[in-house]
C-alpha cells in the first residue's frame, strides 16, 4: 500500500505540471488565432 501511495505522490505533480502546461499552451494558441474569444 505504501509503495503504491509513494508512486502516486511522485507521479501526480508531474502529471499536473504536464497537464497545466498543455492547457496553457492550448489557451495561448487559441488566443493567438482568436484574440477576442476570451473577452465576454
From Swiss-Prot:
Membrane-crossing residue ranges in chain numbering: 12-34
InterPro entries in UniProt: PSI_PsaJ, PSI_PsaJ_sf
GO CC, any one term: chloroplast thylakoid membrane
Predominant location category: plastid
Keywords: Chloroplast, Membrane, Photosynthesis, Photosystem I, Plastid, Thylakoid, Transmembrane, Transmembrane helix
Membrane topology per record: Single-pass membrane protein
Family matches, as Pfam families: PSI_PsaJ (PF01701)
GO terms under biological process: photosynthesis
Secretion signal, residue range per the UniProt entry: none
Keyword RNA-binding listed: no
Subcellular localization(s) per the UniProt record: Plastid, Chloroplast thylakoid membrane
Function statement: May help in the organization of the PsaE and PsaF subunits.
Homology family: Belongs to the PsaJ family.
Protein name: Photosystem I reaction center subunit IX
Source organism of this protein record: Emiliania huxleyi (Coccolithophore)
Gene transcribed to yield this protein: psaJ
Amino acid at each position: 500500500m505504501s509503495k503504491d501511495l509513494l508512486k502516486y505522490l511522485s507521479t501526480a505533480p508531474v502529471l499536473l505540471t504536464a497537464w497545466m502546461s498543455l492547457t496553457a499552451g492550448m489557451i495561448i494558441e487559441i488566443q493567438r488565432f482568436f484574440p477576442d474569444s476570451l473577452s465576454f
